Each structure stands twice: as C-alpha cells, then as structure tokens.
Design a protein with these regions (language model features):
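Beta1/beta-strand and adjacent pyrophosphate-binding region of the FAD-binding site
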Residues: 2-14
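Active-site-adjacent segment of FAD-dependent monooxygenases/related oxidoreductases
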Residues: 43, 47-109
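Conserved mid-domain beta->alpha element of the FAD-binding
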Residues: 13-20, 24, 246-325
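A conserved short coil-to-beta-strand element within the FAD-binding core of flavoproteins
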Residues: 119-133
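Core beta-strand elements of the Rossmann-like FAD/NAD(P) dinucleotide-binding domain
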Residues: 138-147
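C-terminal helical "tail/cap" subdomain of flavin- and related membrane-associated enzymes
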Residues: 3, 231, 292-372
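Conserved FAD-binding catalytic core of PHBH/FMO-like flavoproteins
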Residues: 147-248
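Glycine-rich FAD pyrophosphate-binding loop
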Residues: 23-43
Length: 372
C-alpha cells in the first residue's frame, strides 16, 4: 500500500491552506473531504495581517487581495457618536489591513493552489503504526501517511479525542446575521448600543456583513429581527433577506498532537465569531505547522512540533479570552451600565490602550505574528 507523506483531513479554508503550502514546498500531500460539494455562503470573511503574510508562501495572498476589500480603519460607536477609531493602517506589518471577502472566494483561491480534493471520503479511524498512520475510510480501502493532519472542524474531534476530553462552553447569547447591500465604504463599524451590539463589516461589491446581538432566545424571524435591530440601533434602514441566527461556544483542546496525528483549526479550538478571529486562528495553526511537517514527513524526528503545539495552544487560549470579552461587551445593558461602558471604552481606546487594542484585534499578539 503506497504511503503519502502528509494526509490532510478536511478541505475547508484551514485544510486547503495547509495543503497548498505543503504542495508549494514539494511535499507529497493528499487532501480528503467527506462533503461531496463545496459549502456555499460567506461564513468567515476577514483575513488578518499575520495570516496574509504567511499565505504568501503558497502564492495565495495575491489572489485573495485581488478579490477582497482592504479594511484599513475600524470604528467603535455608541449612541450615534464615535467612541474611537481603530487604525489598522498604522500597524507595523506587511499587510496593515484586514482583507474581507466571502469565504467561498477564499476557498476558490486556495483550491486552485492545493492538490485535488478527494471528495466523499469519510475518515472513520486513525491508527498509529511504527512508520506512519493507517487511515480507515468508510466503504473503501485504508489509506496510509507518514503524518495526518485533522482539519475537519469540530466534527473531526472524535478521530483524536475521547468523549469529554475537549470541554465546550455554550454561551447563552444568540445573534442574527446577513450579508446585505448597504452604504458604509471600506470601514468596519461596531455599534455598542443599549439593546446590544451591531457589527457592520464591508464586503466586495458594495455589500456588508451585519451581525446583531439577539438576546438569549431563538429568533423566529431572523430577517425581520435584523432589519428592526439595525434600524433602532444604528439608524440605517436595510433590506434583509436570507438572514440566519446562531449561537456561540468556546472550546480549546488539551493537546494538538497525538504521535503522528496533528489537529488544527476548529477541530482543536472554537472561539466566538464575534471579533472575527476563529478562521484566522486555524490558518495560523496550519501555516506555522507546514514548514515543520516537511522534514518530519521525510524521516526527521518532528523537531519543533512540540514547541509549535505550546505556542498554538497559548494563542488559542488568548483568542478565546478576547472573544469572551467581545461577547460581554456586545450584550444589552441598562442606561447606567451602557453610559459607563461607553465612557470606559472611549477613554481606553483613545489613550495608550488604543494601540494595544488594535494589535489584539488585528491578531498581532498571536505568537505566529512575529516577523509578519
């Protein structure tokens, strides 16, 4: 049975980015995906500067930037007034902005650079052997690889972790979301209002991603709720169709490595999407792992992978804490608490803390950001 150097399980943005990077390094890499078709929609939309820099190795950055809106400025607002501006264009980085584009576009760019995806392949088991990993596949012959990377989202955790090993905290908060045609230009805006947050991020083609806090109960009519919430909280009337509601949860795995099996992305950690760091966290997992896998898959001892694991776990915990802070700030509040929150944010963001805040939200504090 032939043995692949690296097998990547999962062809979402994280798995594709890893496979494309490894392919550019000349690694024999295979990519399998249980879904028979590419998922539609614009789930994660923002790619931060550290990930953009690391995507250069595979050639993906140029293709992404050709399709993206570059967000150089963000605004925190409350009660119709500007609390503070967030200046990504002042970052000391190769890419001092956030690249915003539909996730489907990101996947198209990465797919063109990655090896062909073998779709309809459901991985059922991973068994360590002396010189690699045997991969059990539903209804097909086993596969073998020197190293296996699980990048298949939360559904892939059972391949690596026992039940209960990855503790998951479900937040009570509900949100509604839609991509709409709306004014606003290439500026990201976060409206921190008494009734809850509204996030408004630019997308190509004059569209925007809108996300609104919706309390703690299921929303029966997401489109109607979002229309009313945006009008009340921001004063902007929009036409919302195709809105959806979602909840948030937090999980960080205790380890990212089991012998020759590595776990990256949502399979290893989930953070609230409020703040837009989840996909980037996975991309940074993959893109910092790639240069370590190349020698390991060719007979090396995996030197550096343990350090990589420690760094990525630390970054995941940091991102989870920041996402929790975003969730707290986005909840509804009474008049006094709202006034106090607005005053505190205005003071913090316009003072020395503003630069640190910008670094944190641009993921410049992630351990993978050094040198990017």
């Amino acid at each position: 049975m032939p043995m692949t150097e690296v097998l990547v399980v999962g062809a979402g943005p994280v798995g594709l980015a890893l496979a494309a990077d490894l392919r550019a390094r000349g690694v024999d890499v295979a990519l399998v995906e249980r879904r028979t078709e590419v998922g539609a929609g614009t789930r994660a939309i923002g790619i931060h500067s550290p990930a953009l820099a690391l995507l250069e190795a595979s050639g993906a950055t140029d293709g992404i930037l050709e399709r993206a809106v570059r967000i150089a400025r963000g605004e925190a607002r409350a009660d119709g007034r500007l609390l503070a501006a967030i200046r990504f264009d002042r970052l000391r980085a190769r890419h001092p902005y956030v690249a915003a584009l539909p996730q489907s576009d990101t996947i198209e760019v990465l797919t063109a650079l990655a090896p062909p995806v073998r779709r309809g392949v459901t991985v059922e088991s991973l068994r360590q052997e002396a010189d690699g990993v045997r991969v059990g596949v539903a209804g097909a012959d086993d596969l073998r690889a020197k190293v296996v990377v699980v990048a298949s989202g939360w559904a892939g955790r059972s391949l690596v972790y026992r039940d209960g090993a990855v503790r998951t905290h479900h937040y009570p908060d509900r949100y509604v979301m839609a991509d709409v045609t709306a004014p606003g230009g290439p500026v990201a805006r976060v409206h921190l209002e008494r009734e809850g947050v509204v996030e408004s991020f630019p997308l190509p083609g004059g569209r925007r991603r809108l996300v609104a806090w919706a309390g703690r109960e299921e929303v029966p009519d997401a489109a109607a709720f979002l229309h009313q919430a945006v009008a009340r909280r921001t004063g902007v009337e929009i036409d919302t169709t195709g809105a959806s509601s979602f909840g948030v949860r937090r999980a960080v795995a205790p380890a990212l490595r089991r012998g020759r099996v590595i776990v990256v992305g949502d399979a290893a950690h989930e953070v609230s999407p409020i703040g837009g760091q989840g996909m980037n966290l996975g991309l940074l997992d993959a893109l910092t792992l790639a240069p370590l896998l190349t020698p390991w898959a060719r007979g090396g001892d995996g030197d550096g992978v343990d350090r990589w694991e420690r760094d990525r776990l630390a970054s995941a915990r940091h991102a989870a804490r920041l996402a929790f802070l975003n969730t707290l700030l986005g909840r509804a509040s009474g008049p006094r608490a709202h006034a106090a929150r607005s005053a505190a944010l205005r003071t913090a963001l316009r003072g020395p803390g503003g630069a640190l805040f910008t670094q944190a939200y641009a993921m410049r504090l992630d351990r993978a950001a050094s040198g990017t």
